[in-house]
Amino acid sequence: MLSQRLIGRTAVKSAFRPSGLPTVVNASRWRRGYATEADRDLVIIGGGVAGYVAAIKAGQEGMKVTCIEKRGTLGGTCLNVGCIPSKSLLNNSHLYHTILHDTKHRGIEVGDVKLNLGQLMKAKEQSVSGLTKGIEFLFKKNGVEYLKGTGSFEDPHTVKVELNDGGETRVTGKNILIATGSEVTPFPGLEIDEKTIISSTGALSLDHVPKKFLVIGGGIIGLEMASVWSRLGSEVTVVEYLDQIGGPGMDTEISKNIQKILKKQGINFKTGTKVLNGEKTGDGVKINVEAAKGGKPETLEADVVLVAIGRRPYTKGLGLEKIGIELDERGRVIIDQEYRTKIPHIRCVGDATFGPMLAHKAEEEAVAVVEYIKKGYGHVNYGCIPAVMYTFPEVAWVGQSEQDLKKAGIPYRVGTFPFSANSRAKTNLDTEGFVKMLADPETDRLLGIHIIGPNAGEMIAEGTLALEYGASSEDIARTCHAHPTLAEAFKEAAMATYSKAIHF
């Protein structure tokens, strides 16, 4: 039976997957300065996506759980200063830009349109607040103890918690889970003040629209924030060290296409360009750059500079060295395929360890690690972790890119279908982009799926499911898709992969 096969399946061994979880003892928030009497089954340090999902799952499994979070609100970077607030700004800035530039030819004429940046930010904060309160409700529903404070190891079974409202307590556990997430990677010589030199956190809460907005780093975070502020009226320039935007995981053909589209929207790009240094001026910042391969230096000026060169694991102050937990050269907690550190009852998941720093990857690991602790088995397929960039159009992919397959010497065939030939996209007047599929030329098994176009982030779910179950392009092509829908482009791309598309 399928269920039996899934239960027997172990976590995929990949470049990023260690394992393991410990049982934890918890301390009461009211017994400050004293150890608690009762051990917890699981103590979790960190209340971000990995931490809170693990806490809820453990509670559902009947475990006694304590979750420690220093921010004062649950949800971590994703919910408070990442995925969620950025999507609010992306959605509402796109709506504003559409009203300004794209309604007249649709037959909608509007009067004077004004931006109320304060209300835009308020709407973002309301979304965040509602979701964080929702997690607290789920904690109560599932019997999870929530300590607001900073946790650090006192010994392999004891976590000291410095409580946010004063005092300290100690929590002991049979299992301990490190889920402390990540932090912004700083750029040497550029001190972030969240006013003129900002991180992604500052980019989500500016109190004005900068005249000139410069982004260092053309990855997903940089491009999403570039889109927001460009739509709101900034003159935006993106400086990227690599020759393509979107990061190394994005398919090269997709990257070239989204760069052309974003350039048409008014965003300027300097790819293959190295930032040398920078300095604050009276009312802005000067950034010195040159070609990555060497060349004549150039000075760029901006009112605000966003540093978006990536993130790094956050393990500072945990006291890992005190108990002998090892980190690799990039600061990631070293784990095995069951998420265990060298101390078997202490495990780590999410951004603090190996793999892509994605909230949904952390969520999958959180469920798996609790299953390993409680049942002895768990599963995450690291070959089926989708990625989405929420620009307009959106970009989404899962599986291998064309450059991945070429580098590995794996044969493949390609099928594509443009949204310009899709009836729903044409009625929506949003026809930029295409669906691209890569499949094994002999077995027809899908190897990778890449989408640039409207609602790509929603459509990639079908691709992820297809890869998870080992589907062929013909499997997709012979599956009925409703008409007229954007998803028909997915079906047509599959038809083009194993045979020929009908509508192109």
UniProtKB/Swiss-Prot annotation:
Fetch the InterPro entries from UniProt.
Class-I_Pyr_Nuc-Dis_Oxidored, FAD/NAD-bd_sf, FAD/NAD-binding_dom, FAD/NAD-linked_Rdtase_dimer_sf, Lipoamide_DH, Pyr_nuc-diS_OxRdtase, Pyr_nucl-diS_OxRdtase_dimer, Pyr_OxRdtase_I_AS
Q: Which reaction does it catalyse?
A: N(6)-[(R)-dihydrolipoyl]-L-lysyl-[protein] + NAD(+) = N(6)-[(R)-lipoyl]-L-lysyl-[protein] + NADH + H(+)
Tell me the keywords, alphabetical order.
Disulfide bond, FAD, Flavoprotein, Mitochondrion, NAD, Nucleotide-binding, Oxidoreductase, Redox-active center, Transit peptide
Q: Which Gene3D superfamilies match?
A: 3.30.390.30, FAD/NAD(P)-binding domain
Which molecular function GO terms apply here?
dihydrolipoyl dehydrogenase (NADH) activity; flavin adenine dinucleotide binding
Tell me which residues form the transit peptide.
Answer: 1-34
GO cellular component, as recorded: mitochondrion; oxoglutarate dehydrogenase complex
Quote the catalytic residue positions. Answer: 483
How many cofactors are bound and how? Binds 1 FAD per subunit.
UniProt subcellular location: Mitochondrion
Keyword field contains Signal: no
Site (Important for interaction with PDHX and activity of multienzyme pyruvate dehydrogenase complex) residue list: 444, 469
Primary location group: mitochondrion
- Read off the Pfam families from this record: Pyr_redox_2 (PF07992), Pyr_redox_dim (PF02852)
Q: Has UniProt tagged this entry with the keyword Disulfide bond? A: yes
Q: Which residues bind NAD(+)?
A: 217-224, 240, 275, 310
Q: What is its EC number?
A: 1.8.1.4
Please list the residues that bind FAD: 69-78, 87, 151, 180-182, 351, 357-360
PANTHER family linked to this entry: DIHYDROLIPOYL DEHYDROGENASE, MITOCHONDRIAL, DISULFIDE OXIDOREDUCTASE
User: Anything further noted?
Assistant: The active site is a redox-active disulfide bond.
Q: Which function does this protein serve?
A: Lipoamide dehydrogenase is a component of the alpha-ketoacid dehydrogenase complexes. This includes the pyruvate dehydrogenase complex, which catalyzes the overall conversion of pyruvate to acetyl-CoA and CO(2). Also acts as a component of the glycine cleavage system (glycine decarboxylase complex), which catalyzes the degradation of glycine.
Please describe the quaternary structure of this protein: Eukaryotic pyruvate dehydrogenase (PDH) complexes are organized as a core consisting of the oligomeric dihydrolipoamide acetyl-transferase (E2), around which are arranged multiple copies of pyruvate dehydrogenase (E1), dihydrolipoamide dehydrogenase (E3) and protein X (E3BP) bound by non-covalent bonds. The Chaetomium thermophilum PDH complex contains 60 E2 units, 12 E3BP units, about 20 E1 units, and 12 or more E3 units. The units are organized in 1 E2 60-mer, 4 E3BP trimers, about 20 E1 tetramers, and a maximum of 12 E3 dimers.
Q: What is this protein called?
A: Dihydrolipoamide dehydrogenase
